[in-house]
Amino acid sequence: MSQKKAPLFEIRSGTVDALLLSPRTADMDALAAELTRRFADTPEFFSNDVIAIDVRRLAADERLPIDRLVETLTGLRARAIGVVASPEQAEWAQACGLPLLDSHGRRPRGERSEEAAEAVPAAAEPVPAPAASPAPPVEAVAMQPGAMIIEKPLRSGQRVYARGDLVVLDLVSDGAEVIAEGNIYVYASLRGRALAGVKGNLDARIFCTCLEPQLISIAGIYRTGETPWPEAFASKPAQIRLSENTLVLEPLRMK
């Protein structure tokens, strides 16, 4: 008596976390140069993440060479999986061969294929933050379980990457880099580069007891030390967070 053969595959609805890249220029040379400048030295930033390309912020007469952007992203270890476009942009946007996605990163209803069987939600849009309030002490932000703790100073050229929160108990020197998917806590001078929320966590923060960094970044929004830090924060305890897609510096109260 024959038994029913088990299927070798199935196609079903699903979800995959994805980042959302929104170019604001169709000048691919400039865009590629800026992406390379920001991320070529931090290959862990994307680490083979999937990414949706949102072209809706481009002007009506602009057409981005998406195939070239995909090539640039691939070189930075990011994998483009679709394009978010307005109805007017749809024709040229999908000419690159990537599927069209809706504003949430999902393939529109009624369009199904093996290549796009799984719907892909985009990273959440930033939610406007409430009016600024007095800076809370460090204890106000819960540390994620399994935080990485570094007890030695980080010298120039050293780089540390944490999947959750990162705690550094000694100096982060010029040229050193601390990267975390969660929050970053530096209980010493922060003189190098600190990148928190690198997987798109808009709630991530950076805390340090002496603010002197070359660069700070939260969820890809960054500021460099080329412009002097405000006197109220330079070489002082501070925390950095996002508010309405802008980096906000606040004094850190030490108990």
UniProtKB/Swiss-Prot annotation:
Biased composition regions of type Basic and acidic residues, renumbered to the chain: 103-115
Swiss-Prot/TrEMBL GO biological process terms: cell morphogenesis; division septum assembly; regulation of cell division; regulation of cell septum assembly
S-S bridge residues: none
Region annotation (Disordered) ranges: 103-136
InterPro entries: CAP/MinC_C, MinC, MinC_C_sf, MinC_N, Septum_form_inhib_MinC_C
Lineage: superkingdom: Bacteria
Pro residues bias locations: 127-136
Keywords: Cell cycle, Cell division, Septation
Family membership noted in the UniProt record: Belongs to the MinC family.
PANTHER family named in the record: SEPTUM SITE-DETERMINING PROTEIN MINC
Alphabetical list of HAMAP family matching this protein: MinC
Record note on quaternary structure: Interacts with MinD and FtsZ.
Function: Cell division inhibitor that blocks the formation of polar Z ring septums. Rapidly oscillates between the poles of the cell to destabilize FtsZ filaments that have formed before they mature into polar Z rings. Prevents FtsZ polymerization.
Name of the protein in question: Probable septum site-determining protein MinC
Species the sequence originates in: Ralstonia nicotianae (strain ATCC BAA-1114 / GMI1000) (Ralstonia solanacearum)
Gene from which this protein is expressed: minC
